[in-house]
Structures are given as C-alpha cells and as structure tokens.
Amino acid sequence: MKQIYYVIQALIHGRGANIIKVVSLGLGLTMSILLFSRVVYEQSFDTCFKDHDKLYQLWNIWTVNGEPFPPSEFIIGAAAGGILDAMPEIVESAASTGSWPVSAPIYNGSVRFDDFKVTADSLFFQTMGIEVLSGDPVRELQQKDVIFLSKDLADKMFGGENPIGKIISFNKEIELTVKGTYAALPENCTMRPKAVISLPSIWSRRIGNYSWNGGDSWKEYIRLKQDIDLDELNKRIDMVVQQHIPRSDKLGITVMAKPVRDTYRGYDEVKRMRNIMLILGISILFITTLNYVLISISSLSRRAKSIGVHKCSGAGTGTVFGMFMWETGIIILLSLFLMVFLMFNFREFVEDTTAAKLESLFAVERIWVPLGVTAVLFLIGGVLPGRIFSKIPVTQVFRRYTEGKKGWKRPLLFIQFAGVAFICGLMWVVMLQYHYVINKDPGYNPERVVIGVNNAPDAKARLAARHFYEGLPYVEALTSATSYPSNGYSGQMIPDEKGTSLFSSRYDFTQENYVAFMGMVIQQGRVPRESGEVAVNEEFVRRMHWGKDVLGKSIQTEEGRVKIVGVIKDFNIDGFYSELKPFVLHHHPRDLADLVYLRLKEPFGENLQKLKRDAAEAFPNQTVGFESLEQKMADSYNSVRVFRNATLLAAIAILFITLMGLIGYINDELQRRSKEIAIRKVNGAESFVILEMLVQDVLWISFPAVVAGTLGAWYVGGLWMEQFAVTVGSLVPYYVCVAIVVLILIVSCVISKTWRIANENPVKSIKSE
C-alpha cells in the first residue's frame, strides 16, 4: 500500500506533466482503438449466420469473346435452384433473393416504412441460417403476397401486438399478409433484410427475368451438407450451369461459389481500407506509446533524486520498477476514462466516422481489441521507462543527475515526426480529393434537381400527374427518365454487324427535353424524338471506332435495330470511381417514365418540403417521395467523407501528441544544457545563436523524419487513390507543402519553448547549478 501512496503523491506533485500524459494517451487510445476495432469488425462480417462456414454465395463471371468480366454477385435467377436439384448429395439447400423488385416502401395503414427488404424463395431462412421465431417459411413463402418481418421491424410496426395475420401494403399497391417473424440480424452482415416477401409475389406479376437466359440481378446462396474442396465444388457447379445456359460462341457465363464470409472482406475497397486503417492504427498506437516513453524518460533528471531517496529508504530495483508500473497503470486508467467520455459525448460523430454503432464495435466478442491495445501500451510504455528508472543509482540523492546521452531520445522523436508528416500528408490528400470529386463538373447540371418515382398506374393518371407537377408555382422545369447518371444505369451488350458482342453499354429511356433539362451537350445531330432513334455518347463512338461519321448509323440493341441521330458529350456515370462508360439514350414515348425529374426554384430546401407535402396530398393512394440529385451524388462519396473525417481526427490527435513529446524533450534539453547555454552567453553568444543551435539540433532529427513520413504518405495515398478514375492531379506540390508546414510547426514549437532561456540572464542559470 505504501507503494501506491508514494505513486499517488508523485502523480499529484507532477500533475502538470501527468495531465499532458493523460490527454495525449486518451487521444491516442481513442483513435487507435477505434481504428483497430473497425478493422476487426469488418473482418467479422457474415459470421452471424448459423454454421456460416457451410454457407456460400454464388458469383457470375461473364465472358465476351473470350475476355472475362470481373466477378459479380448478381447472377442469373435459376442458378441456385438448378445447382440444388443437380447436386443434392452436396448441397443441403439453396436460395434466391432480390432487393430491386421490392425497393418501394411498405405501409401499415398510413404509416410508411422504408426498411430494407428482399424477395426470396421458401428455402431462404433454412439456407441462410437465420432463426425463425414464428411461422413456417418453407410452406408460407411458396404462396404469393406473403411477408415475414424481422422482430425489430414487427415491434416497430405493431408495438407489442402479435403481427401474425396482419395485412400491410406494399407501395400502396399490393396487400401482404404477415405470416411469420425472424430474429433481427446484426449490422455486420451483407444480407440483412428487415422483411422478406415471397418470390411468387413477384413471379405472379411477371416482374424480372428469373431464368437461365440473362436476368443477372439476383443474389443467390447455397448451404453445403459436408465440406468439399472449393475448386472441386466450383468445377461441379460450372458443369451444371453449362448444361442449362443457352449456347453461344461469343458470350459465356461461369458461376462459382465463395464462402459467404469472404464476400464483404473480399471487396477491393474493403481490403484497401483495411490495410490503410491498420497502418494508421499501428502508427498512432506506436507514436502514442513512444511519446509516453519520451515524456517519462525526459523527466529522469527531475525525478532521479526522489528515486535515490526511495533506494536509501530500502527500496530495491523491483520496488521502484513496480512503482512506475503502478503509475503507468493509473495514468492509462485515467486515459481510458477520457476515451470513454469522448466516445459517448461525441457518439454521433464517432459512429458516423467509423460507420458502425459503438455497441457493435465493442461487442463482447470484440472486447479483446481495446484490451489488447491497452495491454500493448501498458507493457511498452511502462516496462521501458520503468527499467531505466529502477536502475538509477542511490548516489543520485547526493548530486544533481544529468543524463548526457541522447541516443534513446532521438529515435523516439524521429518516429513521432515521421508519423506526423505521414498522417498530415495523407489527411491533406484525402481532403483535396474529396473536395475535387464533390465539386468536379460531372457533365450535367444537378443544381436544384429532385427525382421522384412515378407510380401512376395508367396513361390518364400519368398525364394528370404531369399537369399537376407542371402547375406547381415553385417548379421551374420537368422531364422524365427511367434512371439517373449517378445510379450507374442498367447495361446491355452491343454487337457488331455479325452479332459478335463488342462491349457492355449503359442505357436510359428519356423524354425529348431531358438532355436540355440536364444541361448535357449535343456534339452532333439532335436528341431522339421517336422510338427507334437513339443518341450515343463520345465514349460509345470511340469504342465502335467510327471516327466522325456517326449520324445515320444503326446498332442492334435489346429494343431492336435503332438509328443514331445524335452524339452527346461525355458525362460522368456512376460517380468518379468509374472510367468513362459508353451510353445509349433512347426516346421514351409516354408522358412520364419511371422517374420524375423536377428543377425547383429557390429557396430550394423550402420548396422541396412543399413539393413533398403537396404531392402526398394530391396522390394519397400512391407512394410519393422526392430526393435531391445533388444529395444522391454526395451520398455516393460518403465513404470518402468518412475517411476524410477519420484522417482529420487522426492528424489532430497525432499532432497534439507529438508536440507534447517535443515539449518534454525540449524541457529536458534545456535543463540538461542550461549551464552550457549560460557559459556560451557569458562568452558573447547572442540569443539568435543560442536559438539557432537548439533549432539545428531538432532539425537534424525532424528533417529526415518528415521526408520519410511524407514518402510514406505518398505511397499510402497512392493506394487510396486507386479507387478513383479521376484524381486531383499531381500531388507532389501538396506533399512538399505539408512537409514544410510540419517543419515550420516543429521549429516554431522549439523557438517558443527556448525563447525565454535564450534571452535570460546567464547568471541565473549558473547560480542554479
């Protein structure tokens, strides 16, 4: 107990330095634990399903003229069922699901619910390994107009009432009967529906292509009875598929299975961000730990005498070591309290930055992450200084202790300076790229444009809806289409004159005024005005190798043979993650297509709210909702925004931590060299000379460290930039500027801390010796 008493007294006596330790450790622990927890959380995706190691997802690989396309998790509808029928000795069950046919909201009375839903067959729950709480899905999901609700959605819709037998509405068009409930799924799974609608509900209305011939828009899964070599499994699956798909010399398809757990963590962007977050987490933890070591060891000269007193009183090496470990433990505990305070007081921001709820990040099965990070900090941050302190000889009680060797301090400072340059450089590049893609001209004008779904059931209702929207005083213009650019559009294969598939092109059906409404540019010809006419973009022309002679040519599409009457200037499709894509613009003959486009007058936000209210009153029996196109575009870069926030927080934390370590180093140097400085001044050295000497001492460490850190930022920033088709340009000037700013901050910190002693009377320093 005496050890703890002396430790507490030492902490109180040095409370100024200890507050700095607590704050720097608290910030470092917060950032590193959040980063490591996020990495582990992402690696745990899809482990919530029962016996997840037996659950596999099916993937498509299309081949055009022998050239394979990247694997796609959206596959042809009949594949899963066909594999189950052909391989009953291996496959226990199979399921087909689709979210696009049931993307509209469901209603309980007049209350709208936009929760994620899928349509699925009767073996969905058995295949996925999801616990069914009530109902018989194998029997009920074979019927049309049936829905199963997750427990949390059922509670939200009906409170404590039994939902079985309740009638709800899909899109105010189809009445669905609730036939069962199932356990809610955690956030970390790729298939997490809040409601499951029976697949016959879709089939009976002839929605979608559910066959062996195209229609690759379904997510499908199989559950195995027994372990089997993955290569052998995929070989047998491919044999089944080849027996059923239509024969084609030009177009081929391969279906393969992958463990469901590899789906999320196999995405390129997830693997890229995992590596970057690991680097950031390790950097911050390493720098935080070494900063604590640096601050602790820098207090050696101040604390040597008290340790000598303890040893004179009978304390051995182990006792002194134990006292320092107790001190480290208490400081880390206080830092953890600060971390918890920060996380819960800034919970919304933290959850937005990590893209996960705190209770998910720190679930019981992942609590080892913060414990492990804390243990690493305690062992390195406690053992290294503790051993140095415990070896101080008892003779230090009789004389002033000055540690003349700087070998152990310089590497610590080097690592911290390199870490600051690395994280600040990466942060600046991420911020520049985010600003660039958000503000770059996409080739059309989304300003004040809103998009809503047209649910008018017939031509008369469509015409009435058009007149209603055009008559609103705050609507500037109206047009219509079946999709929108940032959504990526659907695709179709474009063949040559011999029927050989050349490439996949995006396409849309729009009204005649669509191009002018969107601010797109016609390079040649005009817009389509009737069926059988199309306009193509410049990239389409390049893919066809037509040169400038384009107008009047015809191409084969899924709509038949069509004539090209115009060429549109290239515009961005599917965000700046993708290269330019070929595009075909068809004419839509009806008054309104699937989507209604409106350009509103200012004030935009106020008029959008008026539009939602007026449309809901005008069409009470339809699902009506409008969203800003600019907001949809911004949402597509949400992961970039989140990473920008994370790097900004990391940069602020690491800059504060490093400056605290630098201040500790400077204080120790000033105390160690105070007599030398005084003698130099007595011998005629000016204040500027003293400052120059101390600044050069730090620059010998900081300059190569900042160069190394900047090179690291350049490498990691390059990895992160790989996800974009367009980038901000040459980043070298920005990296150089960041390096210079970091060096200026370091030099400014040195000058501010040494200014007083460089200008004080040297007699005071000599007297204190």
Where are the regions a protein language model picked out?
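Membrane-helix entry/capping segments
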Residues: 2-4, 9-17, 49, 236-283, ...
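Intracellular coupling helices
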Residues: 4-16, 20, 24, 290-331, ...
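Hydrophobic alpha-helical transmembrane segments of multi-pass inner-membrane transport and secretion
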Residues: 13-40, 270-305, 333, 408-433, ...
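Membrane-proximal extracellular/periplasmic loop immediately following the first transmembrane helix
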Residues: 35-103, 213-223, 231-236, 256-262, ...
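Hydrophobic alpha-helical bundles that form the membrane domains of multi-pass transporters
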Residues: 268-347, 352, 368
